């Protein structure tokens, strides 16, 4: 991983990512900041289950990654590290760490399987995926999103896999 990408991954904040403009399996990543917050707090297994399941369903579906996936992985890894540190004294943290290991295993298997596919060339920098040309519109318009999905999503799904494998070798 190059130093620019490493620094970006280490310093980017949830609020720096335009989640409402990133695709997921079922729409946009608008709810991700709140879901990351629930996971970070580790207050209850029930709350962690709901937030974690929603994130998992939206970053990977049928071995496909979405535009939000590589960015979500940054924050899930940070949450995992915190859960590991707190797992001895917090049963929710212990549970969350186990669940994240399962999710990371699924992600790693998708990466392994995806390496056999053809990929778009990766962008020079990880954060280039947030360039305006790759983002969905600021305003939600379901009809416009459907049209854009049909035209551009194949590239973004394949590019997200290429970015994860090129820039984020720390995830597997």
Write out the residue ranges for each language-model feature.
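N-terminal "cap/leader" segments of large eukaryotic alpha-helical scaffolds
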Residues: 1-48
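Alpha-helical solenoid scaffolds in eukaryotic proteins
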Residues: 30-38, 71-79, 166-171
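Helix-loop junctions that connect tandem helical modules in alpha-solenoid scaffolds
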Residues: 36-43, 79-91, 171-172
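HEAT-repeat alpha-solenoid elements in large eukaryotic scaffold proteins
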Residues: 45-57, 104
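Residue-level detector of extended alpha-helical repeat arrays and alpha-solenoid scaffolds
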Residues: 48-49, 69, 73, 90-93, ...
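Residue-level signature of the C-terminal ends
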Residues: 58-62, 79, 83, 106-114
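Acidic, serine/threonine- and proline-enriched intrinsically disordered linkers and terminal tails
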Residues: 94, 101-171
């Amino acid at each position: 991983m190059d130093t620019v990408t490493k620094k970006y991954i280490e310093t980017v904040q949830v609020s720096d990512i335009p989640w409402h403009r990133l695709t997921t399996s079922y729409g946009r990543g608008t709810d991700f900041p709140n879901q990351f917050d629930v996971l970070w707090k580790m207050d209850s297994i029930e709350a962690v289950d709901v937030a974690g399941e929603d994130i998992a369903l939206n970053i990977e579906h049928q071995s496909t990654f979405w535009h939000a996936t590589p960015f979500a992985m940054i924050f899930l890894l940070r949450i995992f590290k915190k859960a590991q540190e707190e797992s001895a004294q917090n049963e929710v943290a212990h549970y969350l760490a186990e669940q994240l290991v399962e999710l990371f295993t699924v992600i790693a298997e998708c990466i392994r399987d995806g390496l056999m596919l053809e990929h778009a060339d990766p962008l020079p920098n990880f954060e280039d995926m947030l360039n305006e040309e790759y983002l969905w519109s600021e305003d939600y318009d379901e009809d416009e999103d459907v049209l854009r999905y049909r035209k551009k999503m194949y590239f973004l799904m394949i590019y997200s896999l290429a970015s994860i494998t090129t820039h984020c070798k720390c995830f597997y």
